[in-house]
Amino acid sequence: MATTKSFLILIVMILATTSSTFASLEEMVTVLSIDGGGIKGIIPGTILEFLEGQLQKMDNNADARLADYFDVIGGTSTGGLLTSMITTPNENNRPFAAANEIVPFFFEHGPHIFNSSTGQFFGPKYDGKYLMQVLQENLGETRVHQALTEVAISSLDIKTNKPVIFTKSNLAKSPELDAKMYDICYSTAAAPTYFPPHYFTTNTINGDKYEFNLVDGAVATVADPALLSISVATRLAEKDPAFASIRSLNYKKMLLLSLGTGTTSEFDKTYTAEETAKWGAIQWMLVIQRMTDAASSYMTDYYLSTVFQAQNSQKNYLRVQENALTGTTTEMDDASEANMESLVQVGENLLKKPVSKDNPETYEEALKRFAKLLSDRKKLRANKASY
């Protein structure tokens, strides 16, 4: 009798634990963050293609798209472009681009985007005309409010010297942020020295004209927009009961996938204090942006890894990053076919690498685990909505 009672207690405990686990999964907030990096956006594009393919297999649905699974998708610079591609609706109200169309997009348009050189010593390296043309053709007149999930795309307004964050959740308070997606995409990609800043106008709540003078989102925040994406997700909690679980930044209730565009450890080996002490403005200008982007990206990852681990939820955060780029793959504007093929190879090889020295799980295995969580969560929410 005692044995039977103990067995029943054990079953109840298992069921309670299972129920709690599924309830927790259902309440989780899912966030996708995509770094900036110009043509190196091919690397996260390759990763996204793998992830979306896994979701399609798990749900037996060839039409499954990333926007169906993430509550917030954020990006800066080329990450902002990828964000727009997978969240902007087409005529059927589905994302105009599947993940497997991202890399072909770069191969088709990259050589033209990074080929329209101004030929001037003073001024930006590229005129940006082809970039704007292809954005207008693909994104049309779509505005922020039409995005298929919450977005977080950053820029810096050089007239006000303040960051501008384009999100759906801010539109009620700041309707001037309901800009056209092609204006937003160009702005977040307008890296100083590479592309001209972007000027455009929208209307305020009173109908007055509102001006934007914007440059690359990485200048406003950092190349890794993960913290920005989290802050947007947290702000949603103030308005949507479905997000109540993260009102106090409870990372146990959050799934965060952060995709990098690759960095290199060459700087650590190449420059010494003695050598750089002799540098002037031109020498520093050539490398300072890469140095600061790499450092800020590392610190963001370090911070997030620490806080997720502190809440015993390290499995909820995955940073996918190649830290050993070499040669032309380090360049944000080398759109030669050979280099783009190399970037695809970097992304594919990255899937086979371990997540870290302390975690033998490969990125491919980790992404499959994430895909399973995303799939299960979507099914749980769909079942709840059907009652």
Swiss-Prot record:
UniProt short sequence motif GXGXXG, positions renumbered to this chain: 36-41
Is GTP-binding given among the entry's keywords? no
How far does the signal peptide extend, from start to end residue?
Answer: 1-23
Motif DGA/G at which residues? 216-218
Q: Name one GO cellular component term.
A: vacuole
Give GO BP annotations, semicolon-separated: defense response; lipid catabolic process
Motif GXSXG, residue numbers:
75-79
Q: Which InterPro entries match?
A: Acyl_Trfase/lysoPLipase, PNPLA_dom
Return the EC number: 3.1.1.-
Q: Which residues form a coiled coil?
A: 361-385
Q: Name one Pfam family in it.
A: Patatin
The enzyme class is hydrolase
Q: Where in the cell is it found?
A: Vacuole
For this UniProt record, the keywords arranged alphabetically read as follows: Coiled coil, Glycoprotein, Hydrolase, Lipid degradation, Lipid metabolism, Plant defense, Signal, Storage protein, Vacuole
Q: What is its main location?
A: other
Query: Extra info from the record?
Result: Patatin have a dual role as a somatic storage protein and as an enzyme involved in host resistance.
Family annotation (PANTHER family): PATATIN GROUP D-2 (PTHR32176:SF85), XYLOSE ISOMERASE (PTHR32176)
Domain comment, as recorded: The nitrogen atoms of the two glycine residues in the GGXR motif define the oxyanion hole, and stabilize the oxyanion that forms during the nucleophilic attack by the catalytic serine during substrate cleavage.
What does the UniProt record say this protein does?
A: Probable lipolytic acyl hydrolase (LAH), an activity which is thought to be involved in the response of tubers to pathogens.
Similarity comment: family membership: Belongs to the patatin family.
Protein's UniProt name: Patatin group D-3
